[in-house]
């Protein structure tokens, strides 16, 4: 090829495209939407739930009698106070109708809310029977580092279908 062929080729190309208008830009460039506060909180809850709760961990919990557990280093009097109903729960979580994965997220969110609101005691209603949640909730609670103790709730807070949970909220004085 020589320069004359290039000039002829360019001239023919120019003649062919003469009168053609360029296409107007019709593509929109969308920004990725910013995450809402709810989405961020949900992601954070999932992260907390996944890091604290394992479905395979089997703690040593009582088989007979009321469901109860006390963390090491916590006075046994606290468990007695929970049993008698001396602690009034400030927050209540009803897990009826929840799937296991949803219940795990809600439980993590409840514990986080208790710490945030400086609420030392909460009530978790898992329901009657021998269902999955009734078995899993105590196992999850044992694994969370902020849970100091839990006991089957007194009748006024749900009895066999609920647990009163004592949360470690830091160095705040105990509030009953």
From Swiss-Prot:
A Pfam family hit: Smr
Enzyme nomenclature, EC number: 3.1.-.-
InterPro entries: Smr_dom, Smr_dom_sf, SmrB-like
Domain Smr: 93-168
Originating gene: smrB
Molecular function terms from GO: RNA endonuclease activity; rRNA binding
Family in the record: Belongs to the SmrB family.
Source organism (scientific name): Shewanella sp. (strain ANA-3)
Name of the molecule in the record: Ribosome rescue factor SmrB
HAMAP family per UniProt: SmrB
NCBIfam families named among the record's database cross-references: PRK04946.1
Alphabetical UniProt keywords: Endonuclease, Hydrolase, Nuclease, RNA-binding, rRNA-binding
Cytoplasm among keywords: no
Keyword Ribosomal protein: no
Top-rank taxon: Bacteria
Role according to the record: Acts as a ribosome collision sensor. Detects stalled/collided disomes (pairs of ribosomes where the leading ribosome is stalled and a second ribosome has collided with it) and endonucleolytically cleaves mRNA at the 5' boundary of the stalled ribosome. Stalled/collided disomes form a new interface (primarily via the 30S subunits) that binds SmrB. Cleaved mRNA becomes available for tmRNA ligation, leading to ribosomal subunit dissociation and rescue of stalled ribosomes.
Any single biological process term in GO: rescue of stalled ribosome
Assembly notes: Associates with collided ribosomes, but not with correctly translating polysomes.
